Amino acid sequence: MEPGFWHEKWYKQQIGFHQQDINPFLVQYWQRLALPAGAKVFVPLCGKSLDMCFLAEQGHQVIGCELNELAVQQFFSDNQLEMTQTVEGEHQHYQTEQVSLYQGDIFTLPKRITQDVTAFYDRAALIAWPEEMRTQYAKQLANLLPSGSLGLLVTLDYPQETLNGPPFAVSPNWIEAHLTDDFEIQVLACQDVLADNPRFVKKEVPWLNEAAYLLKRK
C-alpha cells in the first residue's frame, strides 16, 4: 500500500478500520503478558486507536508509530489530551504523560525509539499490508523489538478472493511460515466475527475469523 492510500483514507475520514470500542481480545488477554505497570508498549500503525488509552490505563508507557498526521492529532483531540510536539529526525514526535506517538514511516523509525520496550500490541498493522509487503513489515517489527519482548497480535482471516483488502486476510499458516524465525507463537483464541462486520456480510464473505496470538521475540 502506498502512503497516499492511507493519507486519502484519513483525509476523507474513510476509516472503517478504526474501532469505536476497545478490542475485546485486548481486554481479555492483555493480562496474560503479566507486565509491570510502567512497562513500555509499542503500538505499530496505531492510528487514533482507543486501545492505546486502555494500555495507558494499565499504567503502561505507550509508544506508537503512525504514518498519518491527522490520525495522530485526532487521537489527542478526541481524548482531550494536551501534548507537546517536537521533531525527531524525519518523524514528528507528539507526547503527553503516558503516550508518545511518532508520526512518519515505520520503516525508517530509529531503533533507539523502541530499544527499551518490553511489549507490543498489533491489532491493525499486520492485516493492513498486502502479502507482498507483509513480510517486509514483519521483519521490521522484529528488528525494532528487543529480544524477550512479549506481544499480543490480533489478526483477521477470510477467503481473500471474496473481498479486496485492507484489512487483508492473514491465515494461521502464514503466521507459522513467516513469524516463527523471529517469534515464539502461542494461539490464544480464534472466533468467527462475521456477524459483527456488515461490510463482509454485504460482500457475501462466507466466514471471518478473528484470532489472538501471544508472541515472544526470540
Swiss-Prot record:
Keywords: Cytoplasm, Methyltransferase, S-adenosyl-L-methionine, Transferase. Signal peptide: none annotated. The keyword Transferase applies. It is found in: Cytoplasm. It catalyses: S-adenosyl-L-methionine + a thiopurine = S-adenosyl-L-homocysteine + a thiopurine S-methylether. GO terms for cellular component: cytoplasm. GO terms for molecular function: thiopurine S-methyltransferase activity. InterPro entries: SAM-dependent_MTases_sf, Thiopur_S-MeTfrase_Se/Te_detox, Thiopurine_S-MeTrfase, TPMT. Its EC number is 2.1.1.67. It is an enzyme of class 2 (transferase). Belongs to the class I-like SAM-binding methyltransferase superfamily. TPMT family. This is Thiopurine S-methyltransferase. It comes from Shewanella putrefaciens (strain CN-32 / ATCC BAA-453). The gene is tpm.
